[in-house]
Each structure stands twice: as structure tokens, then as C-alpha cells.
UniProtKB/Swiss-Prot annotation:
Family: Belongs to the class-II aminoacyl-tRNA synthetase family.
GO biological process, one term: histidyl-tRNA aminoacylation
Location of this chain's protein in the cell: Cytoplasm
Source lineage: Bacteria, Pseudomonadati, Pseudomonadota, Alphaproteobacteria, Rickettsiales
HAMAP family: His_tRNA_synth
Gene name of this polypeptide: hisS
Annotated keywords: Aminoacyl-tRNA synthetase, ATP-binding, Cytoplasm, Ligase, Nucleotide-binding, Protein biosynthesis
This protein's name: Histidine--tRNA ligase
Record-listed E.C. numbers: 6.1.1.21
Amino acid sequence: MTNQTVRGTKDLLFDEWYKFKYIEQTANRISSLYGFLPAQTPIFECTEVFTKTLGDSSDIITKEMYSFNDKGGKSITLRPEFTAAIVRLLIEKKLQTPIKLFSTGPAFRYERPQKGRQRQFHQINFEVFGIEDPKADIELISLAQHLLTEFGINKNVKLEINSLGDGETITKYREALILYFTKYQNDLSEDSKNRLIKNPLRILDSKDEKDKSIISDAPKISNYYTKESSDFFEQILNGLTILDIPYTVNNKLVRGLDYYCHTVFEFVTEDLGAQGAVFAGGRYDNLVSSVGGKHTPAIGFAGGIERIMELINYSPKEERPIYLIPIGREAEKHALTLANELRRNGLYVIYEYSGTLRTRMKKANQANAKAALIFGDEELSSKTLKIKNMDTGEEKIIARDNTIENIY
């Protein structure tokens, strides 16, 4: 037996846990300002939920999924991302669109653990279904920018955006890339050789040094836009300008999944090393219909909570306790009732059961208590308590019935 976490997983304790919950709760609060409704899916799904949606050229499908056969022989996968499961939810529950859904929780990918990347990680996830207008893209990017500002990290995170265009654009661009990369086929990495057959756009996403110089001279997708694609992208860029959201058009940005069309974007930073994306997403108008639903335009993005934790400065507001110090058997019995009463009035209470008065007062100091309530037989008979202000050292006698009003 080993008493260590599995590689690529982390425990969360104390301040780190509070930081985690702060991010999750902030995202939930901001999402509601934009009309998002909460949605939660299981952490595992039938494997085909992901294989049918993510594309067989994606690294997630080829290398990273945690899949297993259950006792009934059915192939099950721990979710590697949220969109596929949310699409399954949309279809299964026959949700009416347009609709905006917010979700959060753990996801799992078999990757090399490093800063900002774990095998179990947590995401905040936003999906908009049923709106084809580019204003939905603008609003979603604005929401992401709002979150970054709320977290206090917007100055060090930059927006990169691209458009993959419509189906006609992607088809023409795919053909151009096949022609271009075929000339360098022998020089490409093994992954890119496989992608050349399955989805040449994914080569543009390669981080392999062997591919980078070849990619730098590859055709630009903007040369293949249809008028509709160009107009759609132009409206989004104009909207970002109106909202004063700075951006850089990155013609090589394609994202790591096969279902994207039109808008793709990432909010990136150099503060995370190689794992620079804080938020990432895009439009996927054909995904729902490709897995058995009706045609439903959609756009979404996700962010890694652990990555945000690496970037933000957050210290939880310290909650200072009230220390109960009963002296004697009868006082100890009454302390249970008093502790119960104080806690139900929203106060943080530590009931110190044993030790000398001096020892217990020392512990109250160590716990940074704001007040100590001290009582024995004398106080019980007079229905009073002695309260000590731990900051000033001031002591006074108060009526037992007025305890709440006299807490410092």
C-alpha cells in the first residue's frame, strides 16, 4: 500500500480549498448575470459520447481518455471535457433552445503532469445553444473577459482569436493544407503524419519542433473565407472593438478538437509556461446534428480551475472563533447548549473541553479567537458569563440571555 496520491492528482487543503471554491462560486455568480442556467452531468459517460463528438484525430481520443469496460461489458469513459456530455444532455432531455448552460466539476485526461496540467482537473464550462448570431460569440468572449477581471488577472492574459469559417471554407482550406503538407510529409512528426490523413487542420496545433518551421509557411485560412464567413468574423471583431476587448488574430489557432467551425479563441498567458491557455473555446454549429440531434448552432468555452488558481492572489477572509471555556461538570453540560445556540446564529465556535484555564486561554490566543466566554458554577447560578475581548484583554460580566448581543 502507498500513502501517496496517484500521479497527476492533487489534494486540496485549507487556503487552497478556499481559493478553489472562490473561483467556482465566482464563475457561478457571473454566469447568472448573463442568463446561464446550472447543469450537471455524470463524471462518466458511454465512451461513444466522446468518440462520436471529439473527432478521431484529436489527442483526447487517440491518447488521453480514461476508458474501461464495466461489469456489464459496456465501454465507459471518465469525461475528458464537458461539451460532449452537455450535448448528450441537450438531446436526451429535449431541452428547448436557445438556452445557456453553466457547469463545473472534474475531468480526466492521461497527460504528462506539469504546471497547469493534471490528470484529474476541474473546469468551469459555458455553453450557448440555439443562437447563430455573432453577437452570441461577442457576449461569450465578453463573459470570459469579465471573469478574468473579477479574478484580477486580465492584464496578464491576452485574447487570441481566429475563424475557421463555414463548411465550404474548411473544405477548401483542408485541400490546400493537404497539398502543402504532403510536400513535407517525410519531415513531419509522426503525429502530424497521421493528422495529414485524418484532419490536416490539426497539424497547425502541433507543438513539435519538427513541425514548427513547416507550419510557419502554411497557407492562411483567411485566404479561403467565403463572403459569409468573412462577414461573420468581421462582425465579431467589430463587437470586441466596441467593448474595448483587445485581441490578436492568430491564423494558426485551430483548437484541439475536430468539431469547431467559425470562431475559435483562447485567452493565453506566459505565466503558466507551456500550458498558456486559461480559457479556450469556439463555435460548433454542426455538432448537435452530427450525433443525432436537430441542427443547433452553438458556442462555448471552458477554463481550468487549477490554472486559474496558479494565477490569482486570493486569501480567504479569516473567520475568528468564539472560544467557550466551561469550568466544572455542570458548566460543561451547559456549554453544549450555548455552543449550539451561537452556531445557529452564524458564529464560529470552538468548545475547549479540557485543560487548565491558563492552557485553554493560551489555545484561544493561538486560534486567534476574538472573544472567550468563561463560566463556572458561580456564573451558572447567577445566569451570567464572563466575556474576554482577546484583542484588548478587557473582561466583563454579561447576562446569559444577552450573549449574542455582547459578542465582540
